[in-house]
UniProtKB/Swiss-Prot annotation:
GO terms for biological process: heme catabolic process. The gene is HDP. The record marks 172, 197 as: Required to bring heme into proper alignment for the reaction. This is Heme ligase. Its main location: other. It is found in: Vacuole; Host cytoplasm, Host cytosol. Disulfide bonds: none annotated. It comes from Plasmodium falciparum (isolate 3D7). SMART domains: FAS1. GO terms for cellular component: food vacuole; host cell cytoplasm; host cell cytosol.
Amino acid sequence: MKNRFYYNLIIKRLYTRSGGLRKPQKVTNDPESINRKVYWCFEHKPVKRTIINLIYSHNELKIFSNLLNHPTVGSSLIHELSLDGPYTAFFPSNEAMQLINIESFNKLYNDENKLSEFVLNHVTKEYWLYRDLYGSSYQPWLMYNEKREAPEKLRNLLNNDLIVKIEGEFKHCNHSIYLNGSKIIRPNMKCHNGVVHIVDKPIIF
């Protein structure tokens, strides 16, 4: 009887120290409830890095990051992409940058105006997560209070249009999103001043 008393006391303390709950709460399998909890857990998590921090730290953006080291326009590009935004960027991976032949790349790097245009053509205003490009079906989000329709095009920082094309079905997980023919291969890298998606080809006008 005495052992039973101590057993109950220990169990009681365990429940008390586990979040202060003496009565364990029932677990739900309701998808909507789970989605809300996951949303609040991750959507509102603060992010300290900026887009510039991400460019210099991500292994898939090493070649692209070299463009920001340009002696003439590099500092102005860094300044612009460090502002509050929010921005949505579609930066080409190392493999994508290698699609540009050496001669063309050297011409691009040696022409400061073309270099600046090349970088800014990959950046748009506003905050577009991958799901928003497909059309958000859940609400409310952190920055928007209503459902967002999938855009037909986005306007970049140079006022050029990025045509959004969707292939496949989101619910079947066989979908792809293209911007001017460049496919998003790594989405939703959130930053303090926006979000970055990596694409498989440079966006060239």
